[in-house]
Amino acid sequence: PDERLAAAQKENPDTVALITIPGTNIDAPVQQYGDNDYYLRRDEKGTEDYHGCIYADYVCRMDSGVKVSRNLIFYGHTFTDEDYTGGFEDLHNYRVFEFGQENPYIYVSLADEKLTYQIFSVWVCDAKTDTDCIQADPDDAAFQQILDKAVAGCAFDYGVDVTTDDHILTLST
Protein backbone atom coordinates (compact mmCIF):
# COMPACT_ATOMS: atom_id res chain seq x y z
CA PRO A 1 0.00 0.00 0.00
CA ASP A 2 1.09 3.56 -0.78
CA GLU A 3 1.75 5.43 2.48
CA ARG A 4 1.03 8.80 0.88
CA LEU A 5 -2.35 7.53 -0.29
CA ALA A 6 -3.18 6.23 3.19
CA ALA A 7 -2.23 9.61 4.69
CA ALA A 8 -4.36 11.48 2.13
CA GLN A 9 -7.30 9.14 2.81
CA LYS A 10 -6.96 9.87 6.51
CA GLU A 11 -7.33 13.60 5.77
CA ASN A 12 -10.21 13.06 3.35
CA PRO A 13 -12.02 9.73 2.90
CA ASP A 14 -13.05 10.85 -0.63
CA THR A 15 -9.44 10.28 -1.72
CA VAL A 16 -9.41 7.23 -3.99
CA ALA A 17 -6.00 7.41 -5.68
CA LEU A 18 -2.78 9.29 -6.27
CA ILE A 19 -1.70 10.36 -9.75
CA THR A 20 1.95 10.90 -10.59
CA ILE A 21 3.24 12.06 -13.96
CA PRO A 22 7.05 12.23 -14.03
CA GLY A 23 8.45 15.36 -15.67
CA THR A 24 5.45 17.42 -14.54
CA ASN A 25 4.14 19.03 -11.37
CA ILE A 26 1.32 16.45 -11.30
CA ASP A 27 1.74 14.37 -8.16
CA ALA A 28 -1.49 14.66 -6.24
CA PRO A 29 -4.38 12.88 -4.56
CA VAL A 30 -7.46 12.12 -6.64
CA GLN A 31 -10.89 12.64 -5.09
CA GLN A 32 -14.20 11.01 -5.98
CA TYR A 33 -17.69 11.94 -4.89
CA GLY A 34 -21.27 11.08 -5.87
CA ASP A 35 -21.38 13.78 -8.55
CA ASN A 36 -18.79 15.47 -10.75
CA ASP A 37 -19.62 19.01 -9.61
CA TYR A 38 -18.62 18.57 -5.96
CA TYR A 39 -14.83 18.82 -6.43
CA LEU A 40 -15.05 21.22 -9.35
CA ARG A 41 -14.58 24.09 -6.89
CA ARG A 42 -13.16 22.30 -3.82
CA ASP A 43 -9.60 21.40 -2.90
CA GLU A 44 -8.39 17.90 -2.04
CA LYS A 45 -9.54 18.37 1.56
CA GLY A 46 -13.08 19.27 0.48
CA THR A 47 -12.74 22.97 1.32
CA GLU A 48 -14.29 25.43 -1.12
CA ASP A 49 -11.63 26.58 -3.57
CA TYR A 50 -12.11 28.22 -6.96
CA HIS A 51 -9.27 26.14 -8.43
CA GLY A 52 -10.80 22.80 -7.51
CA CYS A 53 -8.62 19.69 -7.47
CA ILE A 54 -8.01 16.52 -9.45
CA TYR A 55 -10.99 14.17 -9.20
CA ALA A 56 -12.26 10.97 -10.76
CA ASP A 57 -15.53 10.77 -12.65
CA TYR A 58 -18.18 9.67 -10.19
CA VAL A 59 -19.06 6.58 -12.25
CA CYS A 60 -15.50 5.24 -12.43
CA ARG A 61 -14.77 2.05 -10.53
CA MET A 62 -11.45 2.16 -8.70
CA ASP A 63 -11.46 -1.01 -6.57
CA SER A 64 -8.51 -2.92 -8.04
CA GLY A 65 -6.91 -3.66 -11.41
CA VAL A 66 -9.54 -6.22 -12.34
CA LYS A 67 -12.43 -3.98 -11.34
CA VAL A 68 -11.04 -0.61 -12.45
CA SER A 69 -13.10 1.02 -15.19
CA ARG A 70 -11.68 0.33 -18.62
CA ASN A 71 -11.61 4.11 -19.23
CA LEU A 72 -10.54 5.73 -15.98
CA ILE A 73 -11.46 9.43 -16.22
CA PHE A 74 -9.77 12.14 -14.15
CA TYR A 75 -10.63 15.83 -14.29
CA GLY A 76 -8.43 18.77 -13.34
CA HIS A 77 -8.37 22.47 -14.11
CA THR A 78 -5.87 24.39 -16.20
CA PHE A 79 -5.42 28.06 -15.36
CA THR A 80 -3.04 29.59 -17.88
CA ASP A 81 -3.61 33.19 -16.79
CA GLU A 82 -2.76 32.63 -13.13
CA ASP A 83 0.18 31.50 -11.07
CA TYR A 84 -1.45 28.21 -10.13
CA THR A 85 0.18 24.79 -10.21
CA GLY A 86 -2.32 22.44 -8.62
CA GLY A 87 -4.12 21.00 -11.61
CA PHE A 88 -3.39 19.78 -15.10
CA GLU A 89 -1.41 22.78 -16.45
CA ASP A 90 1.61 20.63 -17.29
CA LEU A 91 -0.42 18.37 -19.57
CA HIS A 92 0.12 21.04 -22.22
CA ASN A 93 3.78 19.96 -22.31
CA TYR A 94 2.61 16.86 -24.16
CA ARG A 95 1.88 19.03 -27.20
CA VAL A 96 5.63 18.66 -27.82
CA PHE A 97 6.34 15.16 -29.14
CA GLU A 98 9.75 14.88 -27.48
CA PHE A 99 8.25 15.61 -24.06
CA GLY A 100 5.87 12.68 -24.52
CA GLN A 101 8.72 10.41 -25.58
CA GLU A 102 10.76 11.41 -22.52
CA ASN A 103 7.79 11.10 -20.13
CA PRO A 104 5.67 8.25 -21.52
CA TYR A 105 4.14 6.89 -18.31
CA ILE A 106 1.48 7.96 -15.85
CA TYR A 107 1.16 6.21 -12.50
CA VAL A 108 -2.05 5.82 -10.52
CA SER A 109 -1.78 4.40 -7.02
CA LEU A 110 -4.88 2.73 -5.63
CA ALA A 111 -5.36 1.26 -2.17
CA ASP A 112 -4.07 -2.16 -3.21
CA GLU A 113 -1.97 -1.60 -6.33
CA LYS A 114 -0.12 0.80 -8.59
CA LEU A 115 -1.36 1.08 -12.16
CA THR A 116 0.91 2.16 -15.02
CA TYR A 117 -0.54 3.83 -18.10
CA GLN A 118 1.51 4.45 -21.24
CA ILE A 119 0.66 7.50 -23.28
CA PHE A 120 -0.67 6.57 -26.70
CA SER A 121 -2.54 9.76 -27.61
CA VAL A 122 -2.64 13.43 -26.72
CA TRP A 123 -5.37 15.50 -28.29
CA VAL A 124 -7.66 18.42 -27.71
CA CYS A 125 -11.42 18.17 -28.07
CA ASP A 126 -14.46 20.18 -27.06
CA ALA A 127 -15.66 18.60 -23.83
CA LYS A 128 -19.14 20.07 -24.25
CA THR A 129 -19.79 18.48 -27.63
CA ASP A 130 -17.38 15.54 -27.72
CA THR A 131 -18.67 13.46 -24.84
CA ASP A 132 -18.11 10.06 -26.49
CA CYS A 133 -14.72 9.72 -24.81
CA ILE A 134 -16.14 10.31 -21.34
CA GLN A 135 -17.56 6.81 -20.89
CA ALA A 136 -16.07 4.87 -18.00
CA ASP A 137 -17.21 1.39 -19.00
CA PRO A 138 -18.26 1.36 -22.64
CA ASP A 139 -19.01 -1.86 -24.47
CA ASP A 140 -16.37 -3.16 -26.90
CA ALA A 141 -17.77 -1.31 -29.92
CA ALA A 142 -17.97 2.04 -28.10
CA PHE A 143 -14.54 1.50 -26.56
CA GLN A 144 -13.06 0.81 -30.00
CA GLN A 145 -14.60 4.09 -31.20
CA ILE A 146 -12.96 5.92 -28.29
CA LEU A 147 -9.59 4.37 -29.13
CA ASP A 148 -9.96 5.14 -32.84
CA LYS A 149 -10.94 8.75 -32.12
CA ALA A 150 -8.02 9.20 -29.72
CA VAL A 151 -5.50 7.86 -32.22
CA ALA A 152 -6.97 9.83 -35.13
CA GLY A 153 -7.03 13.05 -33.09
CA CYS A 154 -3.39 12.78 -32.04
CA ALA A 155 -0.79 14.62 -34.11
CA PHE A 156 1.93 12.16 -33.04
CA ASP A 157 2.51 8.44 -33.40
CA TYR A 158 3.72 7.17 -30.05
CA GLY A 159 4.05 3.64 -31.42
CA VAL A 160 1.78 2.19 -28.75
CA ASP A 161 -0.85 -0.32 -29.84
CA VAL A 162 -4.04 -0.18 -27.81
CA THR A 163 -6.91 -2.67 -28.10
CA THR A 164 -10.24 -3.27 -26.42
CA ASP A 165 -8.40 -5.65 -24.07
CA ASP A 166 -6.59 -2.68 -22.53
CA HIS A 167 -7.56 -0.14 -19.91
CA ILE A 168 -6.95 3.55 -20.59
CA LEU A 169 -6.72 6.74 -18.56
CA THR A 170 -8.44 9.88 -19.82
CA LEU A 171 -7.25 13.17 -18.35
CA SER A 172 -9.71 15.96 -19.02
CA THR A 173 -9.06 19.63 -18.42
Regions found by a protein language model. Give the residues of each.
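Solvent-exposed, non-transmembrane regions of membrane-associated and secreted proteins
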Residues: 1-173
